[in-house]
């Protein structure tokens, strides 16, 4: 019945992937979204919420909520940015975040390998590429 339905099939895949990612990042007491935001900040310290929003393709208000959670956990700190806009902040990882950085990256690599093991490297590469192309074009 739903073999042609993009909405149904993309969401079914997202739920299945979310279950795997939720379990994987639970050891850090982070949701996958929080973990990926933190990984971005660890890789590129000093990004603004607007830049993070653009990179993660999430609304700025969502990023603000995620940053509040990470700040309460002691994983990020906000500093006044170099912009003329006093409201714009730069986001930096804390030492606590830096201590788990390698473990977060390792977990990301494990998940990638798990997906390759499930669907194969060519299928994985093709699927991610197609999803990114579709997202740009709709």
Protein language model regions, located:
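Short capping segments at the starts of secondary-structure elements
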Residues: 44-48
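Residues within the alpha-helical elements of helix-turn-helix
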Residues: 55
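Alpha-helical DNA-recognition elements
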Residues: 23, 69, 133
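Short alpha-helical "packing" element that flanks the helix-turn-helix/winged-helix DNA-binding module
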Residues: 37-38
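Residues within helix-turn-helix
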Residues: 49-50, 61, 68, 89
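N-terminal leader segment of winged-helix/HTH proteins
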Residues: 1-28
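Charged, amphipathic alpha-helical coiled-coil/dimerization segments
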Residues: 18, 68-129
């Amino acid at each position: 019945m739903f073999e042609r339905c993009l909405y149904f099939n993309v969401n079914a895949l997202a739920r299945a992937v979310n279950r795997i990612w939720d379990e994987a990042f639970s050891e850090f007491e982070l949701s996958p979204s929080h973990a990926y935001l933190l990984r971005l900040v660890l890789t590129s310290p000093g990004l603004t919420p607007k830049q993070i929003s653009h990179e993660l393709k999430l609304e700025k208000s969502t990023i603000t909520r995620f940053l509040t959670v990470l700040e309460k956990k002691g994983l990020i700190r906000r500093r006044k940015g170099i912009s003329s806009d006093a409201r714009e902040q730069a986001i930096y990882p804390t030492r606590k975040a830096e201590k788990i950085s390698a473990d977060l990256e390792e977990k990301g690599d494990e998940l990638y390998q798990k997906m390759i093991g499930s669907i194969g490297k060519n299928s994985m590469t093709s699927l991610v590429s197609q999803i990114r192309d579709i997202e740009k074009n709709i």
